[in-house]
């Protein structure tokens, strides 16, 4: 697992340079939802790896206009793109897949001092999709094996988050350990890593990173209940974090809002 920590010595800088050179000969799989974080990860991976495959999921989400965004983003970036069908919606348990449930309004101040290791059940919103990241990463792991990729890139963060347990560093570390125990690649010495370049970045810092890499955030859809045209509701948790991020970064928000 990796983060965005900077090297602290000349030896660290030399090791970092050698690692970057190694990565340029390797391939990566990027989980691409069509949102702000995942497109930043896509461009981050493009700058580091020889070949990148983007993977998106049609899982019965109410905001499936994000898949249209993901397709356009992948085409703009010039990367291979796979959309995988998984019917998670039949399981229920989330307002993102169950239309009888209400998507709550966002509140960026609801966890001002709470760290990820202090998350409790009351802090997990109903937009959490049961086991979603585990399911997505498992499919990405299979794609990594068939595309001879050493890395899977996912846009989880420990700074700006919605209280999801499957975005924590310890979860990512555990999945990476499992991946190297449970795959042909892992047991034959081809180490698989889960890369989390946004893990320690706020939404504002993520936006700054993306802009430095050439990301067009006008293509992205973050909203949990975007309409068929991709217009965002402006009030859900994801919209609240996105609005806050652009404001803190001092950058104009290119999002099309419903009102």
From Swiss-Prot:
Pathway: Purine metabolism; 7-cyano-7-deazaguanine biosynthesis. Catalyzes the ATP-dependent conversion of 7-carboxy-7-deazaguanine (CDG) to 7-cyano-7-deazaguanine (preQ(0)). GO terms for biological process: queuosine biosynthetic process. SUPFAM superfamilies: Adenine nucleotide alpha hydrolases-like. This is 7-cyano-7-deazaguanine synthase. Gene3D superfamilies: HUPs. Its cofactor is Zn(2+). GO terms for molecular function: ATP binding; ligase activity, forming carbon-nitrogen bonds; zinc ion binding. Binds 1 zinc ion per subunit. It catalyses: 7-carboxy-7-deazaguanine + NH4(+) + ATP = 7-cyano-7-deazaguanine + ADP + phosphate + H2O + H(+). Pfam families: QueC. Zn(2+) binds at residues 223, 233, 236, 239. Keywords: ATP-binding, Ligase, Metal-binding, Nucleotide-binding, Queuosine biosynthesis, Zinc. Disulfide bonds: none annotated. Its EC number is 6.3.4.20. PANTHER family: 7-CYANO-7-DEAZAGUANINE SYNTHASE (PTHR42914:SF1). ATP binds at residues 32-42. InterPro entries: QueC (IPR018317), Rossmann-like_a/b/a_fold (IPR014729). Belongs to the QueC family. The keyword RNA-binding does not apply.
């Amino acid at each position: 697992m990796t983060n965005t920590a900077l090297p602290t010595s000349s030896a660290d800088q030399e090791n970092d340079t050698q690692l970057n050179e190694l990565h340029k000969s390797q391939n990566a799989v990027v989980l691409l939802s069509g949102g702000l974080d995942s497109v930043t990860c896509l461009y981050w991976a493009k700058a580091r790896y020889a070949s990148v495959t983007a993977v998106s999921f049609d899982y019965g989400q109410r905001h499936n206009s994000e898949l249209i965004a993901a397709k356009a983003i992948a085409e703009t970036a010039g990367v291979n793109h796979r959309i995988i069908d998984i019917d998670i919606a039949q399981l229920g348990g989330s307002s993102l897949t169950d239309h009888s449930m209400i998507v709550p309004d966002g509140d960026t101040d609801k966890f001002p001092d709470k760290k990820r290791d202090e998350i409790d059940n009351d802090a997990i919103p109903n937009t959490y999709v049961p086991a979603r990241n585990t399911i997505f990463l498992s499919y990405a792991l299979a794609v990594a094996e068939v595309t001879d990729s050493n890395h899977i890139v996912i846009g989880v963060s420990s700074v700006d988050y919605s209280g999801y347990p499957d975005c924590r560093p310890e979860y990512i570390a555990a999945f990476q350990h499992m991946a190297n125990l449970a795959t042909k690649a892992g047991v034959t010495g081809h180490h698989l890593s889960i890369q989390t370049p946004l893990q320690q970045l706020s939404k504002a810092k993520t936006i700054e990173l993306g802009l430095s890499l050439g990301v067009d955030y006008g293509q992205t859809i973050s909203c949990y209940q975007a309409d068929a045209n991709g217009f965002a509701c402006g009030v859900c948790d994801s919209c609240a974090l996105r609005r806050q991020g652009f404001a803190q970064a001092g950058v104009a928000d290119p999002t099309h809002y419903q009102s």
